[in-house]
Amino acid sequence: MTSIVFMGTPAFAAPILESLIKEQYQVLGVVTQPDRKVGRKHVLTASPVKEVAVAHDIPVFQPEKISGSPEMQQIIDLQPDLIVTAAFGQFLPTKLLKAAKIGAVNVHGSLLPKYRGGAPVQYSIINGESETGITIIYMVKKMDAGDMLAQRAIPIEKNDDTGTMFDKLSLVGRDLLLETLPKLIAGEITAVPQDESQVTFAPNIQPEQEVLDFFTKTAVEIDNQVRGMRPAPIAYAVLDGKRTKFWDVTPLADEVVTQAPGQVVRKTKHELVIAAADHTAIAINQLQPAGKPKMTITDYLNGAADKFATGEQVINK
């Protein structure tokens, strides 16, 4: 039986680990982030991957940083045939990579060489890609730069967000890994180097990227940003003087407007349309003013009877 050490943390990685266990690979240990305090009550919470491991009585290692940790030597001492990572988020030292007898492989959420880095799904949506996918690669010291073992693309639908794409890609990654590992173990697979001329990067999302800019971004680009930031951290703008999270919007492709960016195009009881760059317009469907719950635009406008006149500047630079 082929032995594996699995490394991962979020919900994306949990079905992948579950499938390895069900397929009768010998999972010697699981490496995941330490338990974190979650929510307003700061409840100490295990990662989704740890929950799977504990449910199957698999030893769990939780170093804050694996490089140089006591846990690293313990993992090396397990002498696994394979190391498999999925959304682990840490570099693995060469010494650890070499501990796997067959190799160390990573399940990455993009069509490499595009979108190397920690936020490939988010950038695929923000940049308006029509598809993304999973690439299984050998792990090397350089980030997401290893030779490719397998790749599979799936479409990004117009209503997909980062949450729905993570759910879809998790299952694609699970299935592709289960198809790939037997060939890898049998020596029946030829790894393909990545084309370095096509490399793009997807570094972790920074706070300034959460801000919606109606003055330089078109309605479609704003919609892409909103969906790329959902379900977290949620994109925002200052609307009517208040920091407001935009949960759901619709770009109005057929409308060419004369209002300046950030001005009201129209308002009804159930609709608020705001101008964006290049004479485009966007309808706001769901939002969340600071300190308040998420609400529909209808509920929001109920409390704003005398506001949002056509042409009013409601979003400022």
Swiss-Prot record:
InterPro entries: Fmt, Formyl_trans_C, Formyl_trans_C_sf, Formyl_transf_N, Formyl_transf_N_sf, Formyl_transferase-like_C_sf, GART_AS, Met-tRNA-FMT_C. The keyword DNA-binding does not apply. One of its GO terms (cellular component) is cytosol. The keyword Protein biosynthesis applies. It catalyses: L-methionyl-tRNA(fMet) + (6R)-10-formyltetrahydrofolate = N-formyl-L-methionyl-tRNA(fMet) + (6S)-5,6,7,8-tetrahydrofolate + H(+). GO terms for molecular function: methionyl-tRNA formyltransferase activity. Its EC number is 2.1.2.9. PROSITE patterns: GART. Keywords: Protein biosynthesis, Transferase. (6S)-5,6,7,8-tetrahydrofolate binds at residues 110-113. It is an enzyme of class 2 (transferase). Pfam families: Formyl_trans_C, Formyl_trans_N. Attaches a formyl group to the free amino group of methionyl-tRNA(fMet). The formyl group appears to play a dual role in the initiator identity of N-formylmethionyl-tRNA by promoting its recognition by IF2 and preventing the misappropriation of this tRNA by the elongation apparatus. Belongs to the Fmt family. This is Methionyl-tRNA formyltransferase. It comes from Lactiplantibacillus plantarum (strain ATCC BAA-793 / NCIMB 8826 / WCFS1) (Lactobacillus plantarum).
